[in-house]
């Protein structure tokens, strides 16, 4: 006999589980008042019922203020049985599932459509002085109508205040800008732009672009793709807290990494992957780039291809040939700094990994990747009274 739906706080009829994470579970439900299908994120509150972890508190605060067609709608929030429930509009899938599905052919017009929706949502955030700080394909949700929406604002912050410092341990590593990997604590919207550039590349390649297995290795992947930055490219590089000098590696042509893309797409990618965050194109400027006005026109979201649900949950990554960048000779790969600087940099490598003394410059791995999560971000809990009033 199938499991009977369970009611949550009387109004919502819980159905199947959609996913699980560190803090709780997301499940599909029906709003018995409106008959609307919704997604409910259940988050453990902890010992004090009035308390809430800081990530959930920030997400509620941000989403109550951000209202846009390409940002997920938070419908309701309520505590129930020592859990906090966040009620969102139901979204059918996410961009990661689209990229992974080898049965889906993504045309240049399809890719442009997904990027246009992503850029519009992020531009709205930046107009409101909000950094997302966790841009990645599985945080870009797609509805039954094909509309893409930014989700997961737990790491979002208000920016723009002079001298305000943030943690540099944000974003999943593969989407982390080089200034963050070098320990920058004062940064702005450019970090989101770099992450979206990585998503752009992932849509083109149908696999993650820069797959580092530590912060040091992530930098090696970036330098292999774009060359070691020079002083005239990034004047403030040596001032960053965790700066370490690397042996110069020449950049391959961007065309060699993306051989099939249009000149306009390649030009936009190069501007988004600019090393110096002060010179990196803004998301608003990116929306005005000729890539979005040149042919082909973006696909109507309602006509975008959708992934077929996989019963075994296996990834289709790893079925394509890897694109690699030739490494320089091992002894020239990195200039070894003083011992103290090495120890400083090692402190940013995951505890269960050793800082590699030689670096692998492969851009795309052959094996199915283990997608990293933000394990090093501040996960402390704050006990606060929670405003759950919705207009």
UniProtKB/Swiss-Prot annotation:
Annotated function: May form a stable complex with cyclin CYCH1-1 that phosphorylates human CDK2 and the C-terminal domain (CTD) of the large subunit of RNA polymerase II.
Residue sites binding ATP per the record: 18-26, 41
Active-site residues, Swiss-Prot/TrEMBL: 134
Residues modified as Phosphotyrosine: 23
Modified residue annotations for Phosphothreonine: 167
Keywords, in A-Z order: ATP-binding, Cell cycle, Cell division, Kinase, Nucleotide-binding, Nucleus, Phosphoprotein, Serine/threonine-protein kinase, Transferase
UniProt EC number: 2.7.11.22, 2.7.11.23
Family affiliation: Belongs to the protein kinase superfamily. CMGC Ser/Thr protein kinase family. CDC2/CDKX subfamily.
Modifications after synthesis and translation: Phosphorylated by CDKF-1 at Ser-161 and Thr-167. Phosphorylated at Tyr-23 by WEE1. Autophosphorylated.
Name of this protein: Cyclin-dependent kinase D-3
Keyword Acetylation included in the entry's annotation: no
Taxonomic path: Eukaryota, Viridiplantae, Streptophyta, Embryophyta, Tracheophyta
Catalytic activities: L-seryl-[protein] + ATP = O-phospho-L-seryl-[protein] + ADP + H(+); L-threonyl-[protein] + ATP = O-phospho-L-threonyl-[protein] + ADP + H(+); [DNA-directed RNA polymerase] + ATP = phospho-[DNA-directed RNA polymerase] + ADP + H(+)
Tissue expression summary: Expressed in roots, shoots and suspension cell culture.
């Amino acid at each position: 006999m199938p499991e009977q739906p369970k009611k949550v706080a009387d109004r919502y009829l819980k159905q199947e589980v959609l996913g699980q994470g560190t803090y709780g579970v997301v499940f599909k439900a029906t709003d018995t008042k409106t008959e609307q299908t919704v997604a409910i994120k259940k988050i453990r509150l902890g010992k004090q019922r009035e308390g809430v972890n800081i990530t959930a508190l920030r997400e509620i605060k941000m989403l109550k203020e951000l209202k846009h067609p390409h940002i997920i709608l938070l419908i309701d929030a309520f505590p129930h049985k020592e859990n906090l429930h966040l009620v969102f509009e139901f979204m059918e899938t996410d961009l990661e599932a689209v990229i992974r599905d080898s049965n889906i052919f993504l045309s240049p017009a399809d890719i442009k459509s997904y990027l246009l929706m992503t850029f519009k949502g992020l531009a709205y955030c930046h107009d409101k002085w909000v950094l997302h700080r966790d841009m990645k394909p599985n945080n870009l949700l797609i509805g039954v109508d094909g509309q893409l929406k930014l989700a997961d604002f737990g790491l979002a912050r208000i920016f723009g205040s002079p001298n305000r410092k943030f943690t540099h341990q944000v974003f999943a590593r593969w989407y982390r800008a080089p200034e963050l990997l070098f320990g920058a604590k004062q940064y702005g919207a450019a970090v989101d732009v770099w992450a979206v550039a990585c998503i752009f590349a992932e849509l083109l390649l149908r696999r993650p672009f820069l797959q580092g297995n530590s912060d040091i290795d992530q930098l090696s992947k970036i330098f292999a793709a774009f060359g070691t930055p020079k002083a005239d490219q990034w004047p403030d590089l040596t001032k960053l807290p965790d700066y370490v000098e690397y042996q110069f590696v020449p950049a391959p042509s961007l065309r060699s990494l993306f051989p099939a893309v249009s000149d306009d797409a390649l030009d936009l990618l190069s501007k988004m992957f600019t090393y110096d965050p002060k010179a990196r194109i803004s998301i608003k400027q990116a929306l005005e780039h000729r890539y979005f006005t040149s042919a082909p026109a973006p696909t109507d979201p309602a006509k975008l291809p959708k992934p077929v649900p996989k019963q075994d949950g296996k990834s289709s990554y790893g079925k394509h040939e890897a694109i690699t960048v030739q490494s320089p000779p091992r002894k020239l790969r990195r200039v070894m700094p003083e011992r103290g600087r090495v120890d400083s940099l090692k402190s940013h490598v995951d505890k269960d990994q050793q800082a590699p003394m030689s670096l692998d410059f492969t851009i795309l791995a052959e094996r199915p990747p283990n997608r990293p999560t933000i394990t090093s971000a501040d996960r402390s809990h704050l006990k606060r009274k929670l405003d759950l009033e919705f207009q």
